Amino acid sequence: MKKKILILDDKTEFRRLTKTILSGKFEVESAENGMQGLALLQSGYMPDLIVTDLMMPVLGGKDFVEQVKSSGAFSHIPVIVLSSIDKSDEKIKLINLGANDYLEKPYNPAELLARIENLLKQK
């Protein structure tokens, strides 16, 4: 059975690209922002891993990570943050909030797959 990945990104082209890259190996669901992602989780959808953008409207990646990692029901789910922001202090904040990895956009598809597979092995 394929592992489930939830992708959060407000940019349709990035959601579509990431979904295309991952759908060969994983069952992929997507949402446009953190609020939609939380709604999916609260409705019973339980992914094996979450890939989220940092900058999104309504509920951004930082707040999404904080809510997921502070929730007993979802805190075990590994989270990879994707962002075009390359600031060490932002990466440190996200890791301190519980993000498991951080990858800059544009990303190398093979690197994203390798990071996902590595985190899923650790689970």
Regions found by a protein language model. Give the residues of each.
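Two-component/phosphorelay signaling modules centered on CheY-like receiver
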Residues: 12-29
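Acidic, metal-coordinating helix/loop segments flanking the phosphotransfer/catalytic sites
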Residues: 30-49
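Receiver (REC) domain active-site loop signature in two-component systems and cognate sites
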Residues: 56
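Short, conserved "switch-loop" micro-motifs in signal-transduction and mechanochemical regulators
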Residues: 85-86
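C-terminal output helix
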Residues: 107-117
